[in-house]
Amino acid sequence: MRILVVSLVYPLPTNVARGTFVSDNAAVLTSLGHEVKVINPLPRMLKYQESRRSTLTGVAKAPTNFEHGEVSVFAPRFWGLPGHPYPSLTIRSMRKISKSVTKWLSDWRPELIVCHTIWPVSELANRLAKQWQIPWVAVVHGHDFDVGLQDKNTSNHILRLAKQADQIITVSQRLADVAKDCGITNHSVIKCHTAVEEEWQTKPKNWRGRWRKEKLDILFPADPRRPEKNHYLALQTCEELETRGWIVGVTTLRQQPRTIVWDRMLVANVTLITSNREASPLVARESLICGTPVVSVDVGDVGNYLPEFCLVAEYEPKKLADAIESVLKHDWQEGFELPEEYSFAYVKNQWQSLISNLLEQT
């Protein structure tokens, strides 16, 4: 089966950390025996404008055609202003690039479109699906519902596109509840699988140093420039640990390849997550698979699998520091296993069932 993946974010040649959760999904579809091609519309911008957000790094000079993991990628440009004050401009621009997409695909015609994120790329997915009379699926990872629905400029467009999709996939139950509250009936939950390669997989390790006298390597698994990641709270937590005698070193992640990310998870003592907004943070699960315990505020779906002593309900440095010390005291000899719903095999079966059901309905 030929499947076209449309996404606002996808790894670029100069920013391979961008949109890895989408390339993971492309890998799942490929493993099912489907032929996959990717459309990654990019906003027109100058080099200096990339500094607005880490996910924009590499966008200005990105090639129009490239390959990532043996998957062909086409990156047409569209017009869009920061904050989308004129959404109609973005909509018209997104619809216009359907011609260049059709030309790039040539004789290759998809039988299904999988669109990651709704605004604004679902405008393109919806137009192409109508043009070829095929079903399309929208995958919501969080931003569309958590931020987009609160924005008066985009909320109506997001709801309209979500209801026009043949199926909505959310990556967490919380997002599915939002979809239900908005009157979206054709939705289901498929988690993002944990894609750590076997070479990096190990059991969580126990702390063996001198209590409150040794160096602690804390991993903050995000780019500190992203405000929703709440880097300041992580720094406050580390300061609190230092007042207790710990010598704290903090490592952050800035667009590193996944293998380097996993290497850093292997050597860290604790991974600290302080985000204000998450749907299903991959880094928490990846860290656990790489053998590094995780302390996190209760955000996204981390409460589904993290032990209670690893979770902090309040965004307070002292309580996060207490949780880190509890994690260091814990005996991890018995290991740690994630729920089956985050495994590659489970997610693969869910996508197989979804695709089969869609084909039966059309």
Q: Which role fits each region the language model picked out?
A:
Residues M1-K61:
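N-terminal subdomain of nucleotide-sugar transferases
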Residues L4, G209-K229, L235-C238:
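Conserved donor-binding/catalytic core segment of Leloir-type glycosyltransferases
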Residues N40, I158-T202:
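Donor nucleotide-sugar binding/catalytic pocket of nucleotide-sugar-dependent glycosyltransferases
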Residues L149-K152, K180, A195-K213:
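Acidic anion/phosphate-binding donor-loop and adjacent secondary structure
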Residues N206, E228, K329-E360:
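A charged, aromatic-enriched C-terminal amphipathic alpha-helix characteristic of glycosyltransferases
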Residues N276:
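Aromatic "clamp/platform" in nucleotide-sugar-dependent glycosyltransferases that forms part
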Residues P293-S296:
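Short hydrophobic beta-strand element within catalytic cores of glycosyltransferases
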Residues F309-K318, E325-H330:
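Conserved acidic donor-binding segment of nucleotide-sugar-dependent glycosyltransferases
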